[in-house]
């Protein structure tokens, strides 16, 4: 073969090879795997007597217990313990073994309204929460997401009308306070709509008659939470307040001001300030001596601030915060000694353990994330209207179209949040 032809041939061969490589790099497969989903099984290795099983139960060695358990066992306490373990390990399997109810269970139709550009970080977490809740029930369900992209009155009205056209009987709307106000500008609320992210008291521009009877709210009442902490402020204790430099910080600052708390020093804290917080103080600085510190900063900033205050000789007598810091990340960011005088108000109660465990499998936190918690309450409220005898997982009530939470004060002792027995020392 002449040199020129060979050169052209190899050039074409090289081009073909590169094209194939590019196709392989950009190709995506949308075929579902034929493999069945994973199912946990525990293999029995050695015999275990009744006393042996009871010892394993008392020691909470769940995997050893399940591997040794015999289905012919007649001990009721062992039976109950075994069933509880299986419900956590394989909740879907247990649900499939539950006899079908004779009563009619309607298909659940649910619309999710969200402006992705505004609340995108909540979207996946809330969806996982709702899926976890519905998967612990036996009903068929259909969830459809309607993205308004933003919170302008026009976009929200257009998206709401799309939901109405599809005739969904219930809507969960992930909106900010401004989003709710914009929705009410042009839109008539004709379908029961639940907003898990806003508290009704935030809508100060809307009087009671102007709000639709079909609009419900599930947001945390930060004013009530901060009000519970006032009794922890000593008469001669100067109050220092650190607020986040974002919207939530400004909102909490306004609430603190409305409660007539005399603040000696107030400061908005950015992430840059939080990381170099201790540079403003010397070890023997008496700035925090006998003071009460109110932390209206999110968990990461609070962790940075507390860990650096812990290096000072004089520390605040008490550190007070709200739901914003009821987060296990705070326990990891600080030492127990840095938060021994920290008091946090929390509205979330212990709900159905099976639901909590199932949600955690979908990376949804129902113990500490109040938006997830509130969203699940909204779904349950809807299901309860379909069936008055519906077995509820949450104990919160609905008053004047607002979820009423049971706020309690916790301390961050050791590596967990522990409920205080009394509200005062």
Predicted features by range, described:
Residues 13-21:
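Bacterial N-terminal signal peptides
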């Amino acid at each position: 073969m002449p040199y020129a032809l060979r050169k052209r041939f190899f050039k074409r061969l090289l081009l073909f090879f590169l094209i194939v490589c590019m196709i392989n790099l950009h190709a995506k497969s949308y075929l579902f795997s034929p493999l069945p989903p994973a199912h946990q099984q525990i293999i029995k290795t050695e015999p275990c007597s009744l006393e042996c099983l009871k010892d394993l139960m008392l020691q909470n060695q769940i995997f050893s217990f399940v591997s040794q358990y015999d289905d012919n066992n007649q001990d009721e306490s062992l039976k109950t313990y075994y069933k509880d373990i299986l419900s956590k390990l394989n909740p879907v399997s247990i649900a499939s073994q539950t006899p079908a109810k004779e009563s009619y269970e309607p298909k659940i139709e649910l619309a999710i309204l969200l402006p992705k550009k505004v609340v995108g970080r909540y979207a996946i977490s809330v969806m996982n929460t709702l899926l976890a809740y519905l998967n612990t029930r036996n009903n068929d369900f259909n969830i459809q997401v309607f993205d308004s992209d933003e919170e302008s009155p026009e976009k929200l009205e257009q998206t709401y009308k799309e939901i109405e056209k599809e005739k969904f009987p219930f809507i969960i709307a992930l909106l900010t306070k401004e989003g709710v106000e914009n929705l009410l500008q042009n839109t008539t609320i004709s379908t029961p709509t639940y907003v898990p992210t806003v508290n009704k008291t935030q809508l100060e521009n809307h009087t009671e008659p102007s709000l639709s009877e079909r609009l419900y709210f599930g947001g945390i009442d930060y004013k009530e939470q901060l009000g519970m902490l006032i009794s922890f402020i000593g008469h001669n204790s100067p109050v220092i307040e650190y607020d986040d430099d974002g919207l939530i910080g400004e909102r909490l600052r306004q609430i603190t001001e409305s409660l007539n708390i005399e603040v000696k020093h107030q400061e908005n804290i950015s992430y840059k300030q939080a990381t170099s917080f201790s540079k403003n103080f010397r070890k023997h600085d008496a700035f925090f001596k006998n003071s009460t510190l109110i932390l209206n900063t999110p968990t990461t900033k609070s962790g940075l601030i507390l860990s650096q205050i812990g290096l000072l000789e004089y520390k605040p007598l008490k550190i007070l915060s709200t739901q914003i810091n009821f987060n296990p990340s705070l326990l990891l960011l600080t030492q127990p000694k840095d938060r021994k005088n920290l008091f946090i108000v929390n509205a979330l109660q212990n709900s159905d353990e099976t639901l909590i465990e199932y949600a955690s499998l979908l990376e949804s936190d129902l113990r500490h994330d109040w938006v997830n918690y509130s969203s699940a309450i909204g779904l349950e409220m809807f299901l309860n209207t379909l069936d008055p005898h519906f077995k509820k997982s949450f104990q919160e009530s609905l008053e004047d179209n607002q979820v009423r939470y049971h706020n309690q004060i916790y301390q961050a002792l050791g590596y967990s949040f522990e409920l205080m027995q009394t509200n005062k020392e």
